[in-house]
Amino acid sequence: MRFMVFIKFTEDVGDPPPELVEAMSKAIGGAFADGSMVLTGGLYPLSESTEIRVDQGGLTVVDGPYAEAKEVAGGFAIIDVRDPDEALESARQVAQLHRDHWPAWRGAIEVRRIAGHDDAG
């Protein structure tokens, strides 16, 4: 089963400490080695983003940042695991690394199953 994992936080948290970067690199390397990590990456800030909004008036292109955004996705991963419990455990480990290595960090790890993926394999 494939899942999309989002690391969400407020943009004013600053840069992650080197200890977190090292711990995450090690965890990501292990996940690639065991085949559970498909793709991962960090995202540029909202100031470098653009949305295309659809409403009754048509399409509107809006450059970030967006005043209504409270938490934003700062990173993502696509994982391939046996079941939802394994996906949640993977996300819990990421949250714990943030807690251990960046005590001031506040955010959320969102886990969503990817629709339409062949779960057989």
Name what the model sees in each region.
Residues 1-121:
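Conserved, structured core segments of small domains
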